[in-house]
Amino acid sequence: MKRIIFSLSLLLFIPGMYGQNGHITLEECQQKTQDNYPLVRQYDLVEKTKEYNLENAARGYLPQFALSAKASYQSDVTELPIAIPGVDIKGMAKDQYQVMLELQQQIWDGGGIRMQKKKATAEAEIDREKLNVDMYALNGRVNDLYFGILMLDEQLAQNALLQDELGRNFHQITAYVDNGIANQADLDAVKVEQLNTRQKRVELTSSRMAYLKMLSLLMGEVLSTETVLEKPVPQNELSAVSEIRRPELSWFDAQGAGLQVQEKALNVRHLPHFGLFVQGAYGNPGLNMLKNEFSPYYIAGVRYTLKNDRRVIENKRQQLDSNRDVFLFNTRLEMTQQDQSVRSLEKQMQDDDEIIRLRTNIRRAAEAKVANGTLTVTEMLRELTNESLARQAKAMHEIQRLMGIYQLKYTTNH
């Protein structure tokens, strides 16, 4: 007995091995997906890359050593064009060798190293904001699956009501057959509708299981078929003119800040950069080109550099501004469409209850006519189907409205 209790306790604490049998909300699904998605690990990689780049930039203050070796053979070498009597001047050898150690020390770079650090920080911020954009897109995928399951749940609920109603009609028509009011064909017509409804339930159940499996994969934990997805309750009302808070805007801002850093870096590069260098070498020839033998030598001096490419940054800034404007335009267009869709559904929902009431009255009247022998069972079943479709339409309108509200919420990031 103790062994059984221990085994059950162990199963309860194995991550990803238990079914979520209770209730779960949309926000919980979104958060679990964010935590489980493999892309989340790249946040640490971005931070580490930033640290490495900052360390590399800081090394610019340290002396830089470089060791090089060279061996070459020239097809021709420099020679004196004249002969001097009594003087034997040997020309340079065609095979030449050199080993050099160079030391460079930055004296003043006009703030170049400081700008490299700012650039590393700006690039890390751009990468981080891009990750935020990609991670935020997961919410849209979760929304589609979550509301897809809610729609299937409503259809399954209406399917169960229709099955109950058909079962009641089957017993009623059976009594009519016994009393000679209806015949076997009428009973078969009801049976066909029962079978069609049963097939539809199998299809809906299969679709729900597929959606649950996809949602489970995103979340990283198993959702059982008994899991109840709670209908979300919107906390605030949104419209087509609501403020846009999408992470893409922060990404655009980070890119703009990065271009500002690059522009400031260009200003730094316009300033003279000074550094000392010392080269010590051993080779043949040495600095004396006319001496054909291995010899050591050194060179010391001051180095100056200057560069310029400002137009590239201006083009990138214009492209970034264009991308931002296009994003805002498309987002506003999408918000307008979503807002109009929600308002249209709300207007339709105003008549749903009345349509159901009227369809119910028509179906009851049809049943009474069947009992009196003035209406066929097939015609009565048609009215029963119409009533069921009216109830399904109301349920779908409610879920579609919720989905539209949360699509608008996703589009604006509210």
PLM region descriptions:
Residues 42-57, 134, 138-157, 211, ...:
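Amphipathic alpha-helical coiled-coil segments
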Residues 24-25, 52, 134-245, 387:
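Periplasmic alpha-helical coiled-coil/stalk elements that build and connect Gram-negative outer-membrane
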Residues 6-7, 27-30, 223, 393-414:
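Acidic, low-complexity, intrinsically disordered peripheral segments
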Residues 1-27, 34, 413:
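Bacterial Sec-dependent N-terminal signal peptides
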Residues 96-98, 144, 189, 273, ...:
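Transmembrane beta-barrel architecture of outer-membrane proteins
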Residues 19-66, 181-183, 216-262, 328, ...:
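Bacterial Sec-pathway N-terminal export signals of envelope proteins
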Residues 41, 64-83, 93-94, 104-133, ...:
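Small/polar (Gly/Ser/Thr/Ala-rich) solvent-exposed segments
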